[in-house]
Amino acid sequence: MALNLQNKQAIVTKVKEFAKSALSAVVADYRGITVNEITELRKAGLKVGVKMIVVRNTLMLRIIENTPFLCLKETFIGPTLIAFSTEHPGAAARLLKNFAKNHKKFNIKAAAFEGAILAASHIDQLANLPTYEEAVAKMIYLMKEAAIGKLARLLVALRNQKSETA
């Protein structure tokens, strides 16, 4: 179905607003993946704050102008799916990485985070970023561990001090 100029402009405007508010983006080649599989992937993405789109590469170049994702322009070759993360920077990378494990034809091309491009081989760096809840839990654990360590050192010092005075 051919899009007229007004429809193309509407798509670019709508997706550009979304892209400007996104935290990260992941680009993938979806050749060989069925429509039903892509639909399931999109549904899973919506649950974790990931918006996926498939548009012509020329429109995608217009969409990413003046966004932190301009570094991805070289990856828009062939059938391209782009996933934008809005709630957590690693959500799209994690989702597409897990999808690619089960679908060998699905190929992650690259990702962008804070204006820097990550090659597909380094997608784990983005996918393994802890969520906000995980980071808070880890910080609390480290603070508790530090307090327990201080208490243990204090008790050992008191025991040593008492044994020296006795």
From Swiss-Prot:
Keyword match Nucleotide-binding: no
Top-level taxon of the source organism: Bacteria
GO molecular function terms listed in the Swiss-Prot or TrEMBL record: large ribosomal subunit rRNA binding; structural constituent of ribosome
A Pfam cross-reference name: Ribosomal_L10
A biological process from GO: translation
Keyword Ribosomal protein: yes
Task of the protein: Forms part of the ribosomal stalk, playing a central role in the interaction of the ribosome with GTP-bound translation factors.
Full protein name: Large ribosomal subunit protein uL10
Record's subunit section: Part of the ribosomal stalk of the 50S ribosomal subunit. The N-terminus interacts with L11 and the large rRNA to form the base of the stalk. The C-terminus forms an elongated spine to which L12 dimers bind in a sequential fashion forming a multimeric L10(L12)X complex.
InterPro entries reported in the protein's UniProt record: Ribosomal_uL10, Ribosomal_uL10-like_sf, Ribosomal_uL10_bac, Ribosomal_uL10_bac_type, Ribosomal_uL10_CS_bac
GO cellular component terms attached to this protein's record: large ribosomal subunit
